[in-house]
Swiss-Prot record:
Heterotetramer of two alpha and two beta chains arranged as a dimer of alpha/beta heterodimers. Belongs to the Ntn-hydrolase family. Its EC number is 3.4.19.5. SUPFAM superfamilies: N-terminal nucleophile aminohydrolases (Ntn hydrolases). Keywords: Autocatalytic cleavage, Hydrolase, Protease. Degrades proteins damaged by L-isoaspartyl residue formation (also known as beta-Asp residues). Probably performs the final step in the degradation of the reserve polymer cyanophycin (depolymerizes the building block L-beta-Asp-Arg). Also has L-asparaginase activity. Substrate binds at R201, V202, S203, D204, T222, G223, V224, G225. The active site is at T173 (nucleophile). It comes from Synechocystis sp. (strain ATCC 27184 / PCC 6803 / Kazusa). Cleaved into an alpha and beta chain by autocatalysis; this activates the enzyme. The N-terminal residue of the beta subunit is responsible for the nucleophile hydrolase activity. It catalyses: Cleavage of a beta-linked Asp residue from the N-terminus of a polypeptide. GO terms for biological process: proteolysis. The record marks G172, T173 as: Cleavage. This is Isoaspartyl peptidase/L-asparaginase.
């Protein structure tokens, strides 16, 4: 079977990440590196962990290095991993002072207690002898200081001028869904949270609402965590595929429902037949994928492109090229 892969770097603006070309280069490089693992015989789980690590190590994304700071100025990260073949979920919630939370989720796959938070996650990090690491970047520290230093009047003026200001960090997450040569699926999601949140807040990234996989399909979500939890988006899409809908139908129905509820979210997905799909209610979805023959992405979708798949996007690009050539004549 031809392996398939899709990754995302969140649902936030391209502008604060270096622009279209920079983000595209970063995502495409990671997709290419992870796909090599799959073509070399690596498992879906191997690919997902590798992809999450690479995305966590990229400071422009809100996971691992470059995670946003909470209200007290500390970084607390969450991550989960799901083996679709075994339908086995594991994760850590609000873990600090490590580099790659996905590694802890991977370790927990083989444990009886597979979801740990706060003090339990800290104990596990020591048990695993993970090096102490500060994931906060100068950019995130400065961002936190500016947000904390603003008085209410200034903050309101900024929000009126640009309604997206102040909410972009809430939509930062990274995720990977992979299908290997044996037809097995895995999904992983990691986040630094929404920024300035109350201490103890739990995101969707370490829940089946935000990350879920079975032998039928796998989904990773991004966006406002509370919206994703309310929709139970990842599990909803996967269950619909299991119940007989194809992946495109399952994603379209789930995103249509999310639009009706005025949510702010996005999702990437794969199924056991190798179909690749995505959906979003947010303006931007920073996703890239490998079809087995080519790398593509969703970076230039419009606000009205709420759901789609690799085949449709390829067709749209072909039509666009033909139209451009026709105009040139």
């Amino acid at each position: 079977m031809t392996p398939k892969l899709i990754i995302h770097g969140g649902a936030s603006s391209l502008d604060d990440k270096g622009g279209l070309a920079t983000v595209r280069q970063s995502l495409h490089q990671i997709v290419a590196a992870v796909y090599e693992t799959l073509t070399a015989g690596g498992s879906a789980m191997d690919a997902v962990v590798q992809g999450c690590e690479l995305l966590e190590n990229e400071p422009r994304f809100n996971a691992g290095t470059g995670s946003v700071l909470q209200s007290d100025g500390q970084v607390r990260m969450s991550a989960s991993l799901m083996d679709g073949d075994r339908q086995n979920f594991s994760g850590v919630i609000n873990v600090s002072r490590i580099k790659n939370p996905i590694q802890m989720a991977q370790f927990l796959q083989g444990q009886t207690d597979r979801i740990l938070s706060d003090y339990g996650a800290a104990d596990l990090a020591r048990e695993m002898q993970l090096p102490i690491y500060d994931p906060a970047t100068d950019f995130r520290i400065q961002e936190w200081m500016e947000e904390r230093g603003e008085d209410v009047r200034k903050k309101m003026a900024r929000l009126i001028a640009d309604p997206t200001v102040g909410i972009e960090a809430r939509k930062g997450t990274i995720g990977v869904v992979a299908l290997d040569a044996n037809g097995k699926i895995a999904a992983g999601t990691s986040t630094g949270g929404k920024g300035l949140e109350r201490i103890g807040r739990v995101s969707d990234s370490a829940m089946p609402a935000g990350n879920y996989a079975t032998r039928f399909a796998g989904v990773s979500c991004t966006g406002v965590g509370e919206d994703i939890i309310n929709e139970c988006l990842a599990a909803k899409v996967v269950i619909r595929v299991k119940d007989g809908q194809n992946l495109a139908q399952a994603m379209a129905k789930s995103i249509t429902e999310a639009l009706e509820n005025n949510t702010d979210l996005g999702a990437i997905a794969l199924d056991h037949q190798g179909h690749i799909a995505w959906g979003k209610t947010c303006p931007v979805l920073l996703a890239a994928y490998h079809t087995g023959t080519a790398i593509g992405d969703t970076l230039e979708l419009t606000d009205g492109d709420h759901y789609g798949n690799a085949s449709i996007l390829k067709l749209q690009k072909t039509v666009k090229k033909i139209q451009t050539k026709t105009r040139g004549k």
